[in-house]
């Protein structure tokens, strides 16, 4: 692995792995991940991907071993707090929050328990993988508690008699419900984020990072946007434009065969819901198309 190539650490397996790989491919990076390889070389860019455990990524960044990393904010903050407590380097730069990996770290209790607030957790034993985030939350509330640290299957701890409650990642809440638990407190909200090590970069690496960030912005914006095309009566054009959630003013073009109508094109940064389409139709709009956008650049 050459020091001249940009080194990016990503999760080898898990909830962020697939979407992270897809994002880099949408940014134009060509690579082939197969087998148990730990380092993957991009075929068309001077970039190496390191496939590692998610909890190793923050330390690789903070120790300056890799240049960039994609990591869940929950894992990043857990490691930062742990290293800070140990007096180890914990600096990094956040380049941008990404549009996937959303979850929350929550305290969950028995589904039949009455819960009046954080004070009800006083003196309780709480099972978690995220002991630092839990401690930070409970200390801020000045609530005494004890921790049962587990590295998996946290949700079964109360039934096994290991704890009174748990603090674990929640996406939909289905796992909690299946284990007879309910959310009581949200400790931390998280998404995937792109981070960078501290220190200087040479001109080539800095330019490559800027290029990746620009492409990521385009990919994320395209994913959140739609291209809308329709035909509109000229006498209802202003009313129709007021219904369209466009990023900029729409493009209005004459139709060759119908002087009473124009073609309206625009990029929408919001979803065009069925109700809006029905309102457009009621105003006389026709040939309404809502299309996905693969890439865009402002």
Curated annotation (Swiss-Prot):
EC number: 2.4.2.17
Catalysed conversion reaction: 1-(5-phospho-beta-D-ribosyl)-ATP + diphosphate = 5-phospho-alpha-D-ribose 1-diphosphate + ATP
Transmembrane domains' residue ranges: none
GO cellular component labels: cytoplasm
Presence of the UniProt keyword Membrane in the record: no
Highest taxon of the lineage: Bacteria
Keywords in alphabetical order: Amino-acid biosynthesis, ATP-binding, Cytoplasm, Glycosyltransferase, Histidine biosynthesis, Magnesium, Metal-binding, Nucleotide-binding, Transferase
Pathway: Amino-acid biosynthesis; L-histidine biosynthesis; L-histidine from 5-phospho-alpha-D-ribose 1-diphosphate: step 1/9
Enzyme class: transferase
Cell location: Cytoplasm
Entry cofactors: Mg(2+)
Stated regulation of activity: Feedback inhibited by histidine.
GO biological process: L-histidine biosynthetic process
Subcellular location, principal: cytoplasm
Pfam families associated with the record: HisG (PF01634), HisG_C (PF08029)
InterPro entries xrefs: ATP-PRT_HisG_long (IPR020621), ATP_PRibTrfase_cat (IPR013820), ATP_PRibTrfase_CS (IPR018198), ATP_PRibTrfase_HisG (IPR001348), HisG_C (IPR013115), N-reg_PII-like_a/b (IPR011322), N-reg_PII/ATP_PRibTrfase_C (IPR015867)
Gene Ontology MF terms: ATP binding; ATP phosphoribosyltransferase activity; magnesium ion binding
Family under the similarity heading: Belongs to the ATP phosphoribosyltransferase family. Long subfamily.
Biological function: Catalyzes the condensation of ATP and 5-phosphoribose 1-diphosphate to form N'-(5'-phosphoribosyl)-ATP (PR-ATP). Has a crucial role in the pathway because the rate of histidine biosynthesis seems to be controlled primarily by regulation of HisG enzymatic activity.
Name the UniProt record assigns to this protein: ATP phosphoribosyltransferase
